Amino acid sequence: MKKLLISAVSILVICLGMLYSRDFIDSSNSGDKQTLTIFNWGEYIDPDLIKKFEEETGISVVYETFDSNEAMLTKIQAGSTPYDIVIPSDYMIKKMKKLNLLKKLDHSKIEGFDNIDPQFKDKSFDHNNEFSIPYFWGTLGILYNKTKVPEDLTFEKWNNLWDTRLANNVLLIDGAREMMGIALQSEGNSVNDTNEVNLNLAERKLELLHPNVKAINADEKKMLMINNEAWVSVVFSGDAKAIMEENENMVYALPKEGTNLWFDNIVIPKTSKNEEGAYKFINFMLRPENAAKNSEFIGYATPNTKAKELLPEETTSDEQFYPDLESFGNRAEVYEDLEKKMLQFYNDLFLKFKINNRK
């Protein structure tokens, strides 16, 4: 057994190191201008871009992740971490504006905003992009294994999920807005419906889906689909693309009843202690080569027209992932910010469905 001999000098060095580390952490938390704290979805940026940003700017990035808009909001409201960059979804941006949690953007400091396709600017959740810059966009649809499902099932309708031939082979997203929205759209209603009768009927329809449900999960669905352990999955478009790259038998479909059209944008919360660094990051991500690299790595559609030109034509011409939004009309719906009581009603109904699914 080796003996560890520590001299007095060694102890002094260790103590000084600990003090330095503590001072560094304290300086980061107090707003050290050389640190940028980013709060983002998991696996939602190319790690090489973070390294590139650090090398170009000398700014050290502290990167934290969340798994839902609601979890992100709770952390922001707690105010314990001075986040400089956050990437929430459409309806949550509107809510955060109402709660006075976001800094109004100074567009004179933003370079490359002209690269953003006009159809992704000035959306209802943030008019004139006063508080947010487009990051990614996409749809919610159905991914299926063409070698496993019956040939007559092409999933042009949400109702195909209820086909009895899919017993124990359907994966669902663990999200109240998503799953309640699917049930609502399958009956010709809006994903933002607030009629309690319609919502109760939607939950009852979800109950009828129990025999087909293999699992209600998040990231696990990727491996289950890649390994042919499930035939069908409700997925976001970027996840579908990632799975299709690993399994050539997969097809992504957008039901004709409608889809959730979502947008994730970059915002600067009022907790930010490095606003200058935040603008540098926004400008960095707006550069076409960086936006294109990020889109290729993540798999989601970029709103950056200059970046889109740098992507393979086989990707940008694929209507599964770059659909013609005008052809959807009002059937491509963006989630609205529901009042707290109504959102809880959605959550309670979905929880009821999940509990009954375990029986």
Annotate each PLM feature.
Residues 7, 19-95, 108:
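Early extracytoplasmic/lumenal segment of secretory-pathway proteins
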Residues 82, 87-93, 97-212, 217-229:
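Extracytoplasmic ligand-binding site segments that recognize negatively charged/polar headgroups
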Residues 199-208, 246-270:
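Periplasmic-binding protein-like
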Residues 92-95, 226, 231-249:
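A ligand-binding cleft/hinge motif common to bilobed small-molecule-binding domains
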Residues 97-105, 127-130, 243-254, 317-319:
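Ligand-binding "clamshell"
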Residues 326-359:
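Conserved C-terminal helix/tail region of periplasmic/extracytoplasmic solute-binding proteins
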Residues 1-4:
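Positively charged n-region of N-terminal signal peptides that target proteins for export
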Residues 269-330:
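Mature extracytoplasmic/periplasmic domains
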